[in-house]
Amino acid sequence: MKSKYFLAPISQRAAGGGIAADQTGGEWASEGERKSKYVSRRENSVIKDAYVSMHEWMYMLHQAGWHRRSLLFIMKQTISSCPCILSARGRGFSFGFPRAERFLIYFITKKKGEQDNDSRDKDPLLNPGTLKPLTAQELGAVFCDELVKQELDNEDRYIEIPKKIRDFYKMYRPSPLVRAYCLEEKLQTPAKIYYKFEGNNTSGSHKLNSAIAQAFYAKDQGLKGVTTETGAGQWGTALSMACSYLDLDCIVFMVKCSYEQKPFRREVMRTYGASVTPSPSDTTEVGRKILAEHPGTTGSLGCAISEAVEVATGREGYRYVLGSVLNQVVLHQSIIGLETKTAMDKYDIRPDIIIGCAGGGSNLGGLISPFMGEKLRGEADYQFIAVEPASCPSLTRGVYAYDFCDTGMVCPLAKMYTLGSGFIPSPNHAGGLRYHGMSPVLSQLYHDGFMEARAVEQTAVFAAAEQFARVEGILPAPESSHAIKVAIDEAMKCKETGEEKTILFGLTGTGYFDMVAYEKYHNGQMTDYIPSDEDLQAGFAGLPRVPEAL
């Protein structure tokens, strides 16, 4: 049988309709034979608020004269990467993104609460001066009011995404979930490899998901502007675009080594109206202090955070916003995992292994959020792998303790895996992963054994990036390539054992502004730096002493 697709009448569309489908059967992709066959679909369903579905593209191409065999080849190659996310709404289905975001911290506190009958956060953020739990009022001097509420919220499972943010998301969401057929064929592995691609927006990464949310709450509060840090530049780019969209002032402190390595990234930020300063700088008190103590330093995310916070707290009408680490950012990034899980559930795909790069932890936390919720509730079991650079091994070689979130020791203290706030990592090319700590949420999950971590060297990372780019046609960011490296490793294990595991990883962004790094790799000028035990002990020596009983 054949499927008929037609556009809903204009009047119906204006009333909220979208693509109507008379779907009575047909053929869908058969993985065994690698032939495409449509499966039976819901009959006479009206798809509201729809993006153009893969099936409509197929119909339009067929109408344009494409041969059926060619169309089947296109569907075989693309059906698993169909960017349409399905969710139940009434009788039909909606193609779009989730209307609410999920709190990963909710499931952790609920799990811990079941064990000791107390759902309160056992490891709250601490005031850097008093070492006592921070209040909402104290956090409000640094962050926007609504973001403070989100940061301290351990009770809500979901929050509604404001309409203004949803409208912005329509520019680039939902993002594609892609079956890496060509990579599988190249590796000759029985494993199935999928990646969630977040690079299809102007920032080139997942960072825009949280940037627009934080900028929206700042604008809604009536603020003049925001300050922030950025490593490789994706977060700064995302925030500068979001602020431009909402007419907010944007002040960015960019880690010095990335500022010098990625001049075009900073020009993108300036194009969107942001001011960009290399960090550490002589424009702030904390920057001057760091320069005096570490002459010639190339900076770190911790340094840039300190400078951004100093400026935000010293200017009326400004607040600090951040690109990773804290609960509020992981919350905004949960849209990645919610879209992914909805799409995989729709096509009866269950990942065995879920992999993500980890610097501060927001993209990984967002990707695993709905899957981890199932694991914590005992409903399913997944293998989660966080991948970090060997030059900044927060999880694999760090300690689980309270530490400052920034180098200048002006930010709240968080219970996390850390190398010490004074640790300055080597100037590797994954600027977005050069952070001394890790998300408190992910740290808790790792500490409790729900997630594993691996550290990889950057030459091996770029070898994997090149291999991926040559067969999949996307030039990955250095940060994303850490996940690619481990995904390939796991696929090769399947080749050895014959296991047909399903591997999912987060492709967080593109690397088109990282060509200096690729050039050094191709010219054999890239080196691997692994901190010695002495280097790490020096960082641990600066950890604050926090009373066990708060």
Annotate the PLM regions.
Residues 20-22, 27-32:
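Residue-level detector of structural "landmarks"
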Residues 82-84:
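Cysteine-centered motifs
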Residues 110-223:
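Positively charged, low-complexity intrinsically disordered leader regions
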Residues 157-160, 290-328, 336, 348, ...:
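Active-site/ligand-binding loops adjacent to catalytic centers
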Residues 197-210, 226-236, 326-329, 355-360, ...:
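Active-site nucleophile and cofactor-binding loops and adjacent substrate-binding regions
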Residues 204, 208-212, 228-246, 260-263, ...:
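Short glycine/serine/threonine-rich phosphate/pyrophosphate-binding segments
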Residues 210, 218-257, 350-364, 384-385, ...:
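A short, small-residue-rich loop immediately preceding and capping a beta-strand
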Residues 227, 235-298, 394-406, 515-523:
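Active-site-proximal loop->helix
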